Structure formats: structure tokens, C-alpha cells
């Protein structure tokens, strides 16, 4: 990772996206 804050934000967004997907609603960009 070149930028720590970007790294953390990316990981956080991924978790957030997974959380919403499990909750039954899409959130954020689609990830494979």
C-alpha cells in the first residue's frame, strides 16, 4: 500500500460493503 489512509479506507469500505450485502441491500461499488 502506498497510502496508509487509503489502505484503511479501502479495507473499511470492503467490510462495509460485505456487511450491507449480508443485510440484503447493495452498497458501494460491486466487488467480485
Swiss-Prot record:
GO cellular component, one term: extracellular region
Keywords of the record: Amidation, Disulfide bond, Hormone, Secreted
Disulfide bonds listed in the record: 1-7
Residues that bear Proline amide: 32
Main location: secreted
Transmembrane intervals: none
GO molecular function: hormone activity
Record localization: Secreted
Family assignment from sequence similarity: Belongs to the calcitonin family.
Task of the protein: Calcitonin is a peptide hormone that causes a rapid but short-lived drop in the level of calcium and phosphate in blood by promoting the incorporation of those ions in the bones. Calcitonin function is mediated by the calcitonin receptor/CALCR and the CALCR-RAMP2 (AMYR2) receptor complex.
Protein name (Swiss-Prot/TrEMBL): Calcitonin
Gene name of the encoded protein: CALCA
Amino acid at each position: 500500500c502506498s497510502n496508509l489512509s487509503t489502505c484503511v479506507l479501502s479495507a473499511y469500505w470492503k467490510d462495509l460493503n460485505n456487511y450491507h450485502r449480508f443485510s440484503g441491500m447493495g452498497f458501494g461499488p460491486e466487488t467480485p
